[in-house]
UniProtKB/Swiss-Prot annotation:
It comes from Thermobifida fusca (strain YX). The keyword Cell division applies. This is Sporulation-specific cell division protein SsgB. Its main location: other. Monomer. Interacts with SsgA. Interacts with FtsZ (via N-terminus). It comes from the Bacteria.
């Protein structure tokens, strides 16, 4: 895990769940920045292909570690693998679907660091609404 005063990056090992086959191990890079304090960017690396990138709410991952949450494109829910706490992440788009299985511990550590950077409920303090509106109107 690496961090600066304005961002945090973490690589997490996941398993891609493939029907009728053994899970495929892969790495996802998670990025969080005060420039977009509500979002987590995830880049899923499969083999030598370009990473597949998704953006979803930090709160979605936070809640999904504890209980099932999300609808539509991103769903996250906890599970147990023996004594190991796990989390499932299901992604859906017009181009396909994917389901991943990951250990909770590294995701929790990543989230903890994001909340140290931008505490819950203070995300709007990091957004310049006037600048955002001006950018969209120009």
């Amino acid at each position: 895990m690496s961090s600066s005063g304005t961002s945090i990056t973490c690589e997490v090992g996941l398993q891609l769940i493939v029907p009728d086959r053994a899970p495929v191990p892969l790495v996802a890079r998670l990025d969080y920045s005060v420039d977009d304090p509500y979002a987590i960017r995830a880049a899923f690396h499969v083999g030598d292909d370009e990473p597949v990138e998704w953006i979803f709410a930090r709160e979605l991952l936070t809640v999904g570690i504890i209980r099932e949450t999300g609808e539509g494109d991103v769903r996250i829910w906890p599970s147990q693998d023996g004594k190991e706490r796990m989390v499932n992440i299901a992604l859906s788009s017009p181009f396909g679907q994917a389901r991943f299985h990951a250990q909770v511990a590294p995701l929790s550590e990543f989230l903890h660091r994001t909340y140290e950077l931008v505490p819950a409920g203070q995300e709007s303090d990091y957004i310049d609404i006037d600048a955002e509106i001006a950018e969209h109107l120009s």
